[in-house]
Amino acid sequence: MALKTDIRGMIWRYPDYFVVGREQLRQFALSVKNRHPAHFSEDAAAELGHDAIIAPLTFATIFAKLVQLDFFRHVDIGMETLVIVQVDQRFVFSKPIKAGDKLWARMDIVSVDERFGADIVVTKNICTNDDGELVLEAYTTLMSQFNGDQSAKLRWDSESGQVVRTA
């Protein structure tokens, strides 16, 4: 395998919490063209039994990405995240994400396999609220293929927020 570190079975706890913002939910709903009133209006959300506006289902990707980035910043797996592709993601919700929620996360590395020269990593992300109640479980499959060819010489420049050539 190309992975430098044996991450199978590893549990990564995100070191901070994530507070879900009301305007953040509205902006996200607009960006994904989800016009459901419960994403914009407390009254519409209350009609559905919620005490705050609710997040579009795909909003969870915002927090999931933060957890993954934190993991890759701290665990040297021996390759750039630029060669990692997310090939599958599935969310299992226990309760809706709402404005004002304080969320906590942990990522479990469920499996690491090599198939046809590619490393395939499956993670299970567990998201809980501040009361410790399960909000959602997310299952993500990541794939990387690294054959030693670094001819493109690319890297992520965090200052510019872009992929740049190094040579």
UniProtKB/Swiss-Prot annotation:
Gene3D superfamilies: Hotdog Thioesterase (3.10.129.10). Residues 21-124 form the MaoC-like domain. InterPro entries: FAS1-like_DH_region, HadA-like, HotDog_dom_sf. It comes from the Bacteria. Belongs to the UPF0336 family. This is UPF0336 protein MAP_4109. It comes from Mycolicibacterium paratuberculosis (strain ATCC BAA-968 / K-10). The lineage of its organism: Bacteria, Bacillati, Actinomycetota, Actinomycetes, Mycobacteriales.
